[in-house]
């Protein structure tokens, strides 16, 4: 804890450091990701990572260049993440219907998605270019 509602976390294996701030609507500076922002971002990152693993294992169209737009909606009483909306945007590619189904299934089975409380609404949209 660095004070002023800011934290620092270091990944020991890579020595990479991240910082968090409490959001402005909760007495923080909001200059960095909040802890709940990291949860929402972790969900999107996990989904795309699992799709990348599936692409490698199955030898199907790669997902390199895939991006995600993430929106987190907070609920009150108790304060918590109520909804995470993710739009996963795939780069141009010749994805078959079968590959699309495989990737969509992979996204929903990522460990972060399976670890979040069932009351947290996960809204996922897939955009195939």
List each model region and its residues.
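Extended beta-strand/beta-hairpin segments
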Residues: 1-41, 52-129
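Alpha-helical metal-binding/catalytic segments enriched in His/Glu/Asp
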Residues: 46-47
